[in-house]
Amino acid sequence: MQAHLSHQPCWSSLPSPSVREAASMYGTAVAIFLVILVAALRGSEPPESPFPYHIPLDPEGILELSWNVSYVQEIIHFQLQVQGLRAGVLFGMSDRGEMENADLIMLWTDGDRAYFADAWSDRKGQIHLDSQQDYQLLQAQRTRDGLSLLFKRPFVTCDPKDYVIEDDTVHLVYGILEEPFQSLEAINTSGLHTGLQRVQLLKSEVPTPSMPEDVQTMDIRAPDILIPDNETTYWCYITELPPRFPRHHIIMYEAIVTEGNEALVHHMEVFQCAAESEDFPQFNGPCDSKMKPDRLNYCRHVLAAWALGAKAFYYPKEAGVPFGGPGSSPFLRLEVHYHNPRKIQGRQDSSGIRLHYTATLRRYDAGIMELGLVYTPLMAIPPQETAFVLTGYCTDKCTQMALQDSGIHIFASQLHTHLTGRKVVTVLARDGQERKVVNRDNHYSPHFQEIRMLKKVVTVYPGDVLITSCTYNTENKTLATVGGFGILEEMCVNYVHYYPQTELELCKSAVDDGFLQKYFHMVNRFSSEEVCTCPQASVPQQFSSVPWNSFNRDMLKALYDYAPISMHCNKTSAVRFPGEWNLQPLPKITSTLEEPTPRCPIRQTQSPANPTVPITTEADAE
């Protein structure tokens, strides 16, 4: 049966392309009907289970993505909902969210017929048909508001034009076609309405613990604020626990997003303020506001973190996060990241995080430990670097002193850098050998931060070493980027969530200050430009005067790779464990882990050059 849309004649149902037309497109585009219920490719079945994960792709809510993961088959099923479809849509993935060199699926029309294909874009944004069709269309169905596409793709295709889907951050890209194109090669992404969204596609499948009967909830929400019409806003709000709130365990939390703002609320975090301060000033405004009290910088203890696409976070049945009671600050800071690239005005928001807690304390308190680098300008990244690595250590000496013989069990991790961070990894080493990766994100983005459950719990014993490395890109910088708290300064942190809680709250390092001063003296000696090494000059001032030639860059890398470190092996009171922690040698690692090589799927048959497309049609079900 054939149906027509008078207002969208280009999407009228038509027969599949001829062999000649298919050959001209290198033979793998699939003709589909978009006006009626359209059928699947022969032998393909949509997944039986529902789609557990959903995200809006664009701020207007035109495109919505749902997905389902099969770890056994190593396949993802995608469902793309398109509202008010015009002349087509593209969807895909790229290394950092660029439209160039992207792995894509294309749905487009030439004004007569409609086509679906696996494609890719070159470095100029030109679209090309992929000779290896790894995205398989399963169904295209007309909906009340537009179109629903169901398709699947393996995690790994071993196609050089395809993106390898791993369990780190994925930069999804999308585009909307406003007019027909006579061929796929006539499309360039530069002329399209495009955007990006970040998400973790491959999430850990952890069994959901049952909730106790006495579970209660507490909502930490923004107080009906007006979302600024800026592309990026970090909003801070200080709230307080009820008076004399006793000790409880947080055992689960989930996001509460104001209806209609799903595409604007990017990620949220709840921090507990430092217990040492009896009072914190009230604040409700942008986190970078000049009116923000400096004391809010001491609200850094993460209680909950959510990012777009994340589901509810459950703690292991053995443990819960303590809050309330003696020794715990009643002050909490909510931070909401709004992503508003269209600069939409007049949108009110009361989004936040719902804490589920119980007065029946679990066997263990869950703790949060900071790994990585100390927040100090001693650690810096030269300008114009594409992949500069800084590494922080939690040494065997610290874990030997601070951990019990039974060790601790890390079950979740939140990686953190500021704006120039591109990769983060934490590795556990034992007896001089790297043993396992705690958490890794090779496509890390500072604009997408969440607490991620580990696929397998990592146990850390006394004498183990935890090594956290961050890779930075400062191509657009003219001065060195130093470590610190400011958003234009840098961090390298892994907040690991573990049980049972210990006194060790911070296990981080920085290069020894005396050896850094030797570096500045050496730069003075071999450079025609003078670097101030006088006592009154701050480290940032010294770094700002370094001439960044290749020699000075290489020497700074060597300094960080070999110089002694100052260890911060700190208790919850911010006091170091007793011992000598300055001028400590770097841990000696004799064997390192190699990144696993993706396994290529076994291909039973190759797609024919000019496929015959089986199409079945049904009347519109509405």
Curated annotation (Swiss-Prot):
Residues 1-20 are cytoplasmic. Disruption phenotype: Complete embryonic lethality in homozygous dams, and 88% embryonic lethality for homozygous embryos in heterozygous dams. Only 12% of the homozygous pups from heterozygous dams are alive at birth. Mutant pups have no obvious phenotype at birth, but nearly half of them die within 48 h, and only 5% survive to adulthood. Three weeks after birth, mutant pups are runted and weigh only half as much as their littermates. Still, the weight of adult males reaches 80% and that of females 88% of that of their littermates. Besides, mutant mice display ptosis. Residues 42-621 are intragranular. Keywords: Catecholamine biosynthesis, Copper, Cytoplasmic vesicle, Disulfide bond, Glycoprotein, Membrane, Metal-binding, Monooxygenase, Oxidoreductase, Phosphoprotein, Signal-anchor, Transmembrane, Transmembrane helix, Vitamin C. It catalyses: dopamine + 2 L-ascorbate + O2 = (R)-noradrenaline + 2 monodehydro-L-ascorbate radical + H2O. The modification Phosphoserine is found at residue 350. GO terms for biological process: associative learning; behavioral response to ethanol; blood vessel remodeling; dopamine catabolic process; fear response; glucose homeostasis; homoiothermy; leukocyte mediated immunity. The active site is at residues 234, 416. It comes from the Eukaryota. Its EC number is 1.14.17.1. One of its GO terms (cellular component) is chromaffin granule lumen. Glycans are attached at residues 68, 188, 476, 570. InterPro entries: Cu2_ascorb_mOase-like_C, Cu2_ascorb_mOase_CS-1, Cu2_ascorb_mOase_CS-2, Cu2_ascorb_mOase_N, Cu2_ascorb_mOase_N_sf, Cu2_monoox_C, DBH-like, DOH_DOMON. It is found in: Cytoplasmic vesicle, Secretory vesicle membrane; Cytoplasmic vesicle, Secretory vesicle, Chromaffin granule membrane. Its cofactor is Cu(2+). SMART domains: DoH. Detected in adrenal gland secretory granules (at protein level). Detected in adrenal gland. Proteolytic cleavage after the membrane-anchor leads to the release of the soluble form. Binds 2 copper ions per subunit. The keyword Membrane applies. Residues 603-615 have a biased composition (Polar residues). Its main location: membrane. PANTHER family: DOPAMINE BETA HYDROXYLASE RELATED, DOPAMINE BETA-HYDROXYLASE. Catalyzes the hydroxylation of dopamine to noradrenaline (also known as norepinephrine), and is thus vital for regulation of these neurotransmitters. This is Dopamine beta-hydroxylase. The gene is Dbh.
